[in-house]
Amino acid sequence: MMTLDQLKSHIREIPDFPEKGILFRDITTLLKDPNALRESIVHLNRAVYGIPFDYVVAPESRGFIFGMPVAYEMDKGFIPVRKKGKLPAETIAKEYDLEYGKATIEIHKDALKPGDKVVIVDDLLATGGTAKAIKELVESTGATVSKFVFLIELEGLNGKELLGDTPYASVIKY
């Protein structure tokens, strides 16, 4: 079993990416190591164990990497959140603000129904904008968010403030 410090050591730091002054946390080095990948999934699963929920909801693309194995291990369905125009059937959408513009995310209209409970899984909690938009999209169907779970949290950006009163967990904190 890896300690959290050992797991954290598998995340590469890249200064000045994508722009000067940003320290990028690169998970590709964690994904490359089978033990680190396995341990990250174990920690995410622990964060949702015992919580009543029906589905894992996760955004493309890195949310898929971590959300799918959590859904599999917890014997739950997986609902992908995609960028606008990527899902083939009728969708519902949520537009939200980015640092430099706007983005739109979608789920299939029939993916969730009132009373469904979901856990939202993603690789990173930064400003919280994407997580908030996913929560609002889920709630627009009548479903509820039981918990957010993130592999990494950038605490200095205060993303948790946008999660409202929904419980959340993050495995690695910076």
PLM feature spans:
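Conserved acidic residues
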Residues: 54, 116, 146
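PRPP-dependent phosphoribosyltransferase catalytic core
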Residues: 3, 132-174
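Short, glycine/charge-rich flexible loops or terminal/linker lids adjacent to PRPP-binding catalytic cores
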Residues: 77-118
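Active-site-facing substrate-recognition patch
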Residues: 1-53, 103
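Conserved G/P- and acidic residue-centered "switch" motifs that form tight phosphate/ATP-binding loops
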Residues: 123, 128
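Short Gly/Thr/Asp-enriched flexible loops that form oxyanion-binding sites at enzyme active sites
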Residues: 65-74, 135
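Residue-level signature of catalytic and energy-coupling elements of molecular machines
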Residues: 21, 56, 78, 148
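Short glycine-rich phosphate-binding loop at a beta-alpha junction
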Residues: 53-60
